[in-house]
Amino acid sequence: MSAKVVEILSSEEIRRTLTRLASQIVERTRDLSQLVLLGIYTRGALLAELLARQIETLEGVAVSVGALDITFYRDDLDTIGLRTPTKSEIPFDLTGKTVVLVDDVIFKGRTIRAALNAVNDYGRPEVIRLAVLVDRGHRELPIHPDFIGKKLPTAKEEVVKVYLQNYDGRDAVELIGD
């Protein structure tokens, strides 16, 4: 039997969601000159770039953007296997900055735990916040996003797949299950 695929967000819905997330980030940030968006590879990094462009459109302020590779900070390498790491691209000190970690989907919270550990290697931010496109629940750690594009109750065995134009050739969020 083939898996059932349901589109959760279309290209237009993703665009609107990113506009809303960018507005929320702006509202919660005292000084936009101190704002840094750090995307978690791969799709989180792409989303961080899209959010930065949206913030610049809304506010006329260029926001610093970096990309974070958490490969060596994961606690599940024995389960998922070691993947070829991508070099983090953070060409600035994070000390004193307002850092918003950006990821596509939050599930158990382990990716974010690893990202928090990785951020410490780049300085000591004033505050770290979390923005996700999709929150599917089922947390195993006490981690909660500050900015959520879409809350999506799921079964643990279901899969949420994010597709982004610059990487996958299309924009969509799909729920895959039986």
UniProtKB/Swiss-Prot annotation:
Keywords: Glycosyltransferase, Transcription, Transcription regulation, Transferase. GO terms for molecular function: uracil phosphoribosyltransferase activity. GO terms for biological process: regulation of DNA-templated transcription. It comes from the Bacteria. InterPro entries: PRibTrfase_dom, PRTase-like, PyrR, PyrR_bifunctional. A motif (PRPP-binding) lies at residues 99-111. It holds the Pfam family Pribosyltran. Its EC number is 2.4.2.9. It catalyses: UMP + diphosphate = 5-phospho-alpha-D-ribose 1-diphosphate + uracil. Belongs to the purine/pyrimidine phosphoribosyltransferase family. PyrR subfamily. Regulates the transcription of the pyrimidine nucleotide (pyr) operon in response to exogenous pyrimidines. Also displays a weak uracil phosphoribosyltransferase activity which is not physiologically significant. HAMAP family: PyrR (MF_01219). This is Bifunctional protein PyrR. It comes from Nostoc punctiforme (strain ATCC 29133 / PCC 73102).
